[in-house]
Structure formats: C-alpha cells, structure tokens
C-alpha cells in the first residue's frame, strides 16, 4: 500500500507482432482496504460473512499475539470459524487445529468436498502445511481475504479478492462487534472430529522418538530454536 513502486517489464522484439488484440482479458480484481473505514463498510462485510463456512489460516509472526487472539476469539465464536495452524505459529485461539498436516492427509474425498470453505482469511506468515493446503485450495471457487499491517499481495490459492492493510486485532474486533452468532455450528465440529482421530504411534528409537522425548521435557516458557526443513516438521507432530 506504500510507494514508490518500480516495475520492470521485459519486452521481446516487436518485429512480427501485428497488435491485433482488441480487448484485454477479464481478470480477477483484488481490492485493497485501508484505514479509516466506515461502520457501514464493516456492517456490509459482517453481513457478507453471515452463515458462511469460514477458514482462518494462521501463520507465524503475528504480533502482538495476545491482542490479536483476544479479538479473533470473539469473531471465531460468533462465526463458528475454524483455525488451521501449527505449533510453530504459537496460536492459542479457540477452534484451532494444530495437526493440520495430518488432518489434510487423512481427509476423505467426501470430507474435502463438504468442508470446502466459502471464505479463507489468512493472517501471519509461513506455516508448515503450506504445500498440503495449497494443493487442496488452489483454484477453488471461494473468496480469500488477507489481513496484515503490510498490505502485501499474497495469492497462494489463486482466489485472493481483498487485502486488509491494518492490525489483525482491529479487523477481528470490528467484525465481532457487529456479527450475530452463527446458527451453523457444525463446521468447526466436523474439523475437530477429524483432528482428534489420529495420534502418534508407539515407535522404537529414531529421530522422531528423540525429538518427542526432548520436547516433552522442556520447561514451561522455554525459547526453542529449530533448524529448517525436517526438524520443524517432526517437532510439529509432538
């Protein structure tokens, strides 16, 4: 949302081009919403979300975490939204699914169809289940809203429709103040049933066993640094 912006567009030689295209292709519009926004705007958005299946994808680096969670919790309770996240993102919101990678791997085709969201709301940065969720959601006919202070255009599912350049807690608080409690309370329950079905099997000594044993013995409020790739994925299962 802030400039200056410099765009380099490489052009091949123009020789042999007849410039016969008369109409530009129809493209999907991405709307940037910036503060201040009127109460009427928030009422329209709350009405738009009413009765819809809402999926929040919660990534890393959301600050200040406690304030955002407080605002998000009220929104989640009223809308019956589901939160797909991971342990690394340190999210503690209600209706949160932490073993998202496993859940996406064991979902049946019928469940994938019935649990498709109407709206995707993304906050934060990277998440461990990036490849799995993109494989499922990319190109799906739903609306994607991205919320964050930076106002970045991040369109991993090819359905981004709106960007909310603002603190995440402000976004959730404004909608929660207006929204009525949803009568559709089955969406989050269906996700939780699938999430609670798998567990970590008993295993002999291996990398996953060693990581599991170590992490379970860490004191409360420890600061843990993890190397990239497989170390993060195995730590996520604990």
Q: What do these predicted regions represent?
A:
Residues 135-232:
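Phosphate/pyrophosphate-binding active-site segments
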Residues 9-15, 60-62, 88-89, 151, ...:
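Glycine-rich beta-alpha junction loops
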Residues 232-238:
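Thiamine diphosphate
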Residues 1-51:
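Conformationally flexible catalytic loops at phosphate/diphosphate-handling active centers
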Residues 35-48, 66-69, 202-217, 231:
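A short, well-structured juxtamembrane/interface segment
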Residues 20-37, 89-103, 198-200:
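Acidic/glycine-enriched edge-of-secondary-structure segments
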Residues 58-145, 238:
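Glycine-rich, anion-gripping cofactor-binding loops and their flanking helix/strand elements
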Residues 53-55, 119-121, 223:
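Structural motif
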């Amino acid at each position: 949302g802030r400039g200056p912006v410099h765009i380099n567009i490489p052009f091949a030689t123009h020789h042999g081009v007849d410039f016969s295209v008369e109409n530009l292709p129809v493209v999907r519009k991405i709307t940037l919403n910036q503060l201040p926004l009127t109460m009427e705007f928030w009422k329209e958005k709350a009405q738009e979300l009413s009765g819809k299946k809402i999926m929040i994808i919660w990534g890393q680096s959301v600050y200040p975490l406690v304030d955002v969670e407080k605002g998000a919790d009220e929104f989640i309770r009223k809308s019956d939204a589901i939160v797909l996240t991971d342990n690394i993102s340190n999210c503690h919101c209600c209706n949160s699914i932490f073993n998202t990678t496993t859940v996406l791997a064991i979902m049946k085709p019928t469940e994938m169809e019935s649990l498709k969201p109407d709206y995707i709301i993304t906050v934060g940065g990277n998440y461990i289940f990036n490849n799995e969720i993109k494989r499922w959601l990319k190109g799906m006919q739903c609306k994607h809203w991205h919320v964050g202070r930076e106002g970045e255009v991040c369109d991993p599912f090819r359905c981004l429709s709106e960007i909310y350049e603002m603190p995440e807690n402000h976004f959730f608080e404004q909608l929660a103040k207006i929204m009525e409690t949803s009568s559709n309370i089955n969406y989050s329950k269906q996700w939780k049933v699938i999430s609670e079905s798998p567990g970590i099997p008993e295993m002999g000594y291996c990398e996953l066993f060693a990581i599991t044993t170590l992490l379970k013995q860490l004191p409360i409020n420890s600061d843990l640094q993890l190397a990239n790739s497989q170390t993060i994925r195995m730590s996520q299962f604990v």
